[in-house]
Swiss-Prot record:
Residues 10-84 form the S1-like domain. InterPro entries: NA-bd_OB-fold, RNA-binding_domain_S1_IF1, TIF_eIF-1A, TIF_eIF-1A_CS. Keywords: Initiation factor, Protein biosynthesis. Seems to be required for maximal rate of protein biosynthesis. Enhances ribosome dissociation into subunits and stabilizes the binding of the initiator Met-tRNA(I) to 40 S ribosomal subunits. Pfam families: eIF-1a. It comes from the Archaea. Belongs to the eIF-1A family. This is Translation initiation factor 1A. SUPFAM superfamilies: Nucleic acid-binding proteins. GO terms for molecular function: RNA binding; translation initiation factor activity. Gene3D superfamilies: Nucleic acid-binding proteins.
Length: 108
């Protein structure tokens, strides 16, 4: 039970590629629980914040999110999860983010 790596372990939710979830960066707040999000596939989508997330998780411009595009309208989608700055930096450091949305990359 005594593991030295426990201090450095961070558990981060990743998009479920089988269900079509992708990474995105919030570009603009549109109002009425709507956001303009630049997704990893290069498409800018109009995404909505579901009711269960509205009050619990506040989303701002520049946040890294998981988006699930709608099946019947590909230019729209739902926000599934928002990463904290620490989680986003961790994903960037470990090269888990696609180049197109890796705005957290620290130049060395």
């Amino acid at each position: 039970m005594d593991n030295d790596n426990d201090e450095n372990t961070i558990r981060v939710i990743t998009p479920n590629k089988k269900s079509g979830e992708i990474y995105g960066i919030v570009e603009k707040m549109s109002g009425a629980s709507r956001l303009i999000v630049m997704c990893e596939d290069g498409v800018t989508r109009n995404c909505r914040i579901p009711g269960k997330m509205k009050k619990r998780m506040w989303i701002r411009e520049g946040d890294l999110v998981i988006v699930k595009p709608w099946e019947f309208q590909d230019e729209k989608g739902d926000i599934i999860y928002r990463y904290t700055k620490t989680q986003a930096a961790y994903l960037s450091r470990n090269h888990m983010l696609p180049e197109i949305i890796d705005v957290f990359n620290e130049k060395q």
